[in-house]
Regions:
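Membrane-proximal helix-turn-helix segments that form the acceptor-binding/catalytic region
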Residues: 100-118, 219-220
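Glycosyltransferase donor-sugar binding loop
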Residues: 145, 199-217, 233
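Short alpha-helical donor nucleotide-sugar binding micro-motif in glycosyltransferases
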Residues: 234, 242-247
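Aromatic "clamp/platform" in nucleotide-sugar-dependent glycosyltransferases that forms part
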Residues: 255
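Short hydrophobic beta-strand element within catalytic cores of glycosyltransferases
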Residues: 263, 268, 272-275
Length: 371
C-alpha cells in the first residue's frame, strides 16, 4: 500500500470525513471542529469526501450518533475517531443526563472501540478515555482553528457594535458558546450585575432546544438578565470572528470543558482570556490566561479593563497560544496520524482479518428493520 500523504505527491489521499452536523444540529464546538478539520485538510490538498459511501483511504469520524455508527460498521478502510467528549461532558448539557449517563457511557465506550485509533482533543479527554478502559490506541491531537480567519479586520469592531447597539467606547466582555448550565450562564449574568459599566455579550444559543438541560430555566435566566447583557443567539460561523473583533476580552466561565475552542478563537483575535480555573486549561494554555471563579471574575475583568500593561501582556500571550493551535499544524499532524494508522491496520489485517464489522453491520441493520 502506498502510504505517502504529502500534498505534493501525484496521488492524493482520500479521506472520508464523517459528521452528522453537516445537515443536523450546528452552533456547537463539535461542528466547529469539523469545519476546521475539513478546511485544514483541503488546504493541505487532501481529497476530502463528506459522509460518503464510496471507498476511501481512511475514515475520520467527528460525531458519534447512529449515522456515524452506520458508516463505521460499513467501513472497509481504517478508522480514526475524534473524541470531543467524555461522559462527564453530558451532565449539565442535556436533559436528565445524570439519569441516562450509564447507558450513554456504555454506548460511548462501544462507539470509541470501533475505531482503529481514537484522537483525544485534550489531556483531559485522554484521562477520561483511560478511565473508560478502551481497547484501542488513544492519541492526543488537540483541536485547532484557522488563525487568519479570526484576526480582526478594519471596520469589524465599529460595524458590530453599531449593529448590536453597543457604545463605541464601552468595555466589552464576550462569551461564545451554547447556553446551558455547564457553560456557566449563571456566573456570566451575576458578574454582569456586579459590573454595570461593562457590556457583556454572549454569542450562541441553544441548538439542541428542549434537549438542553434545564431548558426553561435557561430561557427565564436570559430573559431576566440585566440591561448590560446582550444575547446574540445562534450566529453563522463566518460572522463569529467579527464579534470577537468587537470585544475587549473573552470571559469564559464554563464549569466543564474538554478543550474550549472558543478560547483559541478569542486568542487568535488577540483578546485577553479570562477563564474559570479548570484543570483542562493549564496543560493546553500554560500561563496565557487569567484564571478566576464566581467570586473573583468581576475583579479579574476589572483588572484587564483598567490596567493597560496587563491587558497588552495577555494579548501577546493569547496570540502566542493561538499560533500553537493553528489549523495548518493540525493538518500536518493528521496526515502523519493517517499514515501510521493505515500502515498498522494493513499489518494487523494481514495477520488477523477483522470480521466484526460485517457481523455488527448485519445486527444493526436487522435491528433497524424491526423498529
Amino acid at each position: 500500500m502506498d502510504t505517502s500523504l504529502h500534498k505534493n505527491e501525484t496521488t492524493r489521499r482520500v479521506v472520508n470525513l464523517i459528521s452528522e452536523t453537516v445537515d443536523g444540529c450546528k452552533g456547537h464546538g463539535v461542528h466547529t471542529a469539523f469545519l476546521q478539520t475539513r478546511d485544514a485538510l483541503l488546504r493541505a490538498n487532501v481529497d476530502v469526501r463528506i459522509n460518503s459511501s464510496e471507498p476511501a483511504d481512511i475514515m475520520h469520524i467527528q460525531t458519534m450518533g447512529l449515522r456515524s455508527l452506520r458508516h463505521m460498521l460499513g467501513a472497509h478502510e481504517p478508522i480514526v475517531l475524534a473524541a470531543h467528549i467524555v461522559p462527564e461532558s453530558l451532565v449539565g448539557s442535556f436533559i436528565l443526563a445524570s439519569v441516562w449517563l450509564p447507558i450513554g457511557t456504555w454506548y460511548m465506550r462501544l462507539f470509541y472501540n470501533l475505531a482503529d485509533e481514537v484522537l483525544a482533543v485534550s489531556p483531559e479527554v485522554v484521562d477520561g478515555l483511560g478511565r473508560m478502559q478502551l481497547s484501542v490506541p488513544v492519541r492526543l491531537v488537540p483541536n485547532a482553528v484557522e488563525v487568519r480567519r479570526f484576526q480582526p479586520q478594519p471596520g469589524w469592531r465599529a460595524q458590530i457594535r453599531e449593529r448590536a447597539g453597543v457604545d463605541p467606547d464601552a468595555f466589552v466582555a464576550i462569551c461564545v458558546g451554547q447556553i446551558q448550565p455547564r457553560k456557566g450562564l449563571d456566573a456570566f449574568i451575576e458578574t454582569a450585575r456586579n459590573m454595570p459599566d461593562v457590556t457583556f455579550v454572549w454569542v450562541g444559543g441553544m441548538p439542541f432546544q428542549r434537549l438542553t438541560d434545564h431548558y426553561r430555566q435557561m430561557m427565564r435566566t436570559v430573559a431576566d438578565a440585566p440591561a448590560n447583557c446582550r444575547f446574540v443567539g445562534d450566529t453563522p460561523y463566518d460572522e463569529v470572528p467579527q464579534w470577537y473583533a468587537a470585544a475587549d476580552c473573552l470571559f469564559f466561565p464554563s464549569r466543564q470543558e474538554t478543550f474550549g475552542l472558543a478560547v483559541i478563537e478569542a486568542a487568535a483575535a488577540g483578546l485577553p482570556l479570562v477563564l474559570r480555573d479548570l484543570s483542562t486549561y493549564r496543560p493546553l494554555f500554560d500561563d496565557s490566561y487569567l484564571a478566576g471563579d464566581d467570586e473573583s471574575f468581576a475583579q479579574v475583568i476589572a483588572s484587564v479593563r483598567d490596567d493597560a500593561d496587563l491587558r497588552g501582556s495577555y494579548q501577546k500571550r493569547a496570540r502566542a497560544i493561538a499560533a500553537r493551535f493553528d489549523a495548518d499544524r493540525l493538518a500536518e499532524r493528521l496526515l502523519g496520524v493517517y499514515t501510521e494508522v493505515m500502515e498498522r491496520a494493513e499489518t494487523e489485517r494481514e495477520r488477523s482479518p477483522r470480521r466484526w464489522r460485517p457481523m455488527l453491520q448485519w445486527a444493526f441493520t436487522d435491528w433497524r428493520r424491526r423498529r
